[in-house]
Regions:
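Short strand-turn-strand beta-turns centered on an Asx-Gly dipeptide
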Residues: 28-29, 71-72, 250
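Short domain-boundary/entry signatures in modular proteins, especially
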Residues: 18-26, 75-78
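Surface-exposed loop/turn motifs in large extracellular/passenger domains
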Residues: 1, 59-67, 84-101, 108-128, ...
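Acidic Gly/Asp/Thr-rich repetitive segments characteristic of extracellular carbohydrate-active
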Residues: 21-51
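Glycine-rich repeat segments that build the extracellular carbohydrate-interaction surface of secreted
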Residues: 41-55, 66-73
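A recurrent domain-boundary module in secreted/ectodomain proteins
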Residues: 3-21
Length: 320
C-alpha cells in the first residue's frame, strides 16, 4: 500500500494518509521537508501548515495566494528576511503561540512587496539589540517592512523591545504607495511603533499600539479613527514634503500629539521645510499635550494643528 503513497505521506495506525514524521510543513495530508517546498507546490488559496519549529528563509512568489498557519510553531530565519512576500499571504495561528522570528541584523520577520494579512500569531525579532536611538547593538531592524505593499493587521501581535529601529515601516515610492491598515491586534516597541514613511498611506481603526517613544510617526498620509495609542503621535515635515494626519472617531491617544517641523544642516546648508506638517483633530480622546513643535533649529514655518472636535482631559486638568 505504501508504494502508492506520495512522497511526504505515510499511513497512521488507522490506515489514514498523514504527513510523514520528518515533514516540517503540510498541505492537507501531504508533508514537505521544507516550508519553501510546500509554498512552491501550493495551489491557489491553499493553506500551508507548519508542523515543526523550523529555521528557513521563505519567499512567496508573485501571483501566489497562500495562507500560512503557524500551528503553534516558530519559523526563524536562516540568514535573510524570514518571509519575503511578493504574492498574497495570510498569516494565522490556529493553535496559539505561533511565531515568525528574525535573529539577523538588518533583516525583518516580514518584508512585504505584495498583499499581506496578519490574522493571528506573533511577528518579532527576538535578538533585537538596539538600546537607544543611536545604538543598534549590532543587531537591529524593523520587524515588518511594508515596502510598496498592501498590508492589513486584523489581529495577532507585532512586538519588539528595541530602542533603535521602528517596529513597522510603511514606505512607498513616487509610483507605488504603501498601504497599511490596522484594524486590531497588539503592536509594541521600545522606540517608534509605526513609522509611516514617504509615500505611505496609513489607516488605524482599532488595535492597541504601545511605544516608549512615538506610537505613530507620520511623514505622509495617516488617519486614526479608532484603537488605542499608548505613546506620542507626531506628524513631521522636512524639505518639500509634509505629513498630513487626521484623528477622529473613538481613537484614544495616551500621549502628546504634535505637528513637527524638521530642520537639519548638511554641508553647512540649513534645510528648512517649505510646507507645514498638519494635524486635524475631529474626534477621539487625547490624554496629552497638543500643539506644534520643531526638531533642530527654529523653522521658518510652523506646523499646523486644527481642532474641530475631540476630548482633551489632560489639557482640562492642567488649566484648573
Amino acid at each position: 500500500m505504501t508504494d502508492y503513497l506520495d512522497d511526504g505521506c505515510e499511513l497512521d495506525e488507522t490506515g489514514s494518509v498523514v504527513p510523514s514524521d520528518d515533514s516540517v510543513a503540510s498541505i492537507g495530508n501531504k508533508g514537505y521537508h521544507s516550508l519553501e517546498a510546500a509554498i512552491t507546490e501550493a495551489k491557489e488559496g491553499a493553506t500551508v501548515t507548519l508542523l515543526k519549529n523550523v529555521t528557513e528563509d521563505v519567499t512567496i512568489p508573485a501571483n501566489t495566494t497562500v495562507t500560512l498557519d503557524l500551528n503553534g510553531k516558530t519559523l526563524t530565519n536562516e540568514s535573510s528576511h524570514t518571509i519575503t512576500n511578493h504574492g498574497t499571504l495570510t498569516i494565522k495561528d490556529s493553535v496559539g503561540g505561533g511565531t515568525v522570528d528574525n535573529v539577523t541584523h538588518a533583516k525583518g520577520a516580514l518584508v512585504n512587496y505584495g498583499n499581506a494579512i496578519l490574522e493571528s500569531g506573533t511577528l518579532t525579532r527576538s535578538k533585537e539589540a538596539g538600546s537607544s536611538p543611536s545604538t543598534s547593538g549590532g543587531n537591529s531592524w524593523y520587524v515588518v517592512d511594508n515596502n510598496k505593499g498592501t498590508m492589513t493587521v486584523k489581529g495577532g501581535n507585532i512586538v519588539s523591545t528595541g530602542k533603535f529601529s521602528s517596529l513597522i515601516r510603511n514606505i512607498g515610492d513616487s509610483t507605488t504607495k504603501a498601504q497599511l491598515t490596522i484594524e486590531s491586534g497588539k503592536l509594541s516597541n521600545g522606540f517608534i511603533a509605526v513609522k509611516n514613511d514617504d509615500n505611505g498611506d496609513l489607516k488605524i481603526s482599532g488595535g492597541e499600539i504601545t511605544s516608549d517613544d512615538q506610537a505613530v510617526q507620520n511623514w505622509s498620509q495617516a488617519e486614526i479613527s479608532g484603537g488605542t495609542m499608548n505613546g506620542a503621535v507626531y506628524t513631521w515635515a522636512a524639505d518639500n514634503s509634509a505629513g498630513q494626519m487626521t484623528i477622529s472617531g473613538d481613537a484614544k491617544i495616551n500621549g502628546n500629539v504634535y505637528s513637527v517641523q524638521y530642520v537639519y544642516t548638511d554641508n553647512e546648508i540649513v534645510h528648512q521645510p517649505i510646507v507645514s506638517a498638519a494635524t486635524k483633530i475631529e474626534g477621539g480622546t487625547i490624554v496629552g499635550n497638543v500643539g506644534a513643535a520643531y526638531s533642530g533649529s527654529a523653522p521658518n514655518t510652523l506646523g499646523v494643528v486644527t481642532v474641530s472636535g475631540g476630548n482633551f482631559p489632560y489639557l482640562y486638568r492642567k488649566s484648573i
